């Protein structure tokens, strides 16, 4: 078993997703837009499921995730504890079935902005469960099937728009030509379903709003130079955060791009995908990587 995948056992049957918001939680200062880079390559063992959690709520505090056969027996998962905005956990491997899941303020197991009473996970399937809306409207999670294709000698890419107040965006070449990711809106992914294939190699892309954004007008905030795309790998990039919090810094240079560590679900580090990630959002984007824990 890959040491990067955590096993949970003793959990039950099948069902649907039900969620409630409980307990008082204070909102934090809204965070700027970020691209969260995750490596999707790999597959669960037969009869198992993989699930990971993305903290994308721009004003929610750091959280711990509790999992059990039901909410009453849910226990903290060490590798899903202390998640802060813009972080995505490693995959957790579980038997197919239904799980009670609580998302609680870090260190406060009774202060839980989200309770998922019945999260159904199918066998031989990978999932990302994301919280993307502001805390006050965090009613339901976004659940995505990570339907990675078989390797074909190219890189597989998808972009997921999870910024609730950000308009549509396009990814363009330096000459202004489309690469096929245009008009991506919240809360959608591109492609849908599946992933786009890109030949391995070096790419030089920029990201622009699909329409003018006040007060800046035409906005192309990301232009990091040529980046490398690796063959045989699958990636997701999730756009999270608040455009309103980002626009005052829209003309600032983007932050440095950092690849995932060797404890991500897989260790490949295609920085290009962080560029493509920005197709899900606009305005002074800072790119971050998946968080890895032991």
Where are these regions (language model features)?
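Intrinsically disordered, low-complexity polar regions and short flexible loop motifs
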Residues: 25-293
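Short, intrinsically disordered, low-complexity terminal/loop segments
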Residues: 2, 293-294
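Bacterial N-terminal signal peptides
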Residues: 11-20
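Intrinsic low-complexity, intrinsically disordered segments enriched in polar/basic residues
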Residues: 3-4, 21, 123
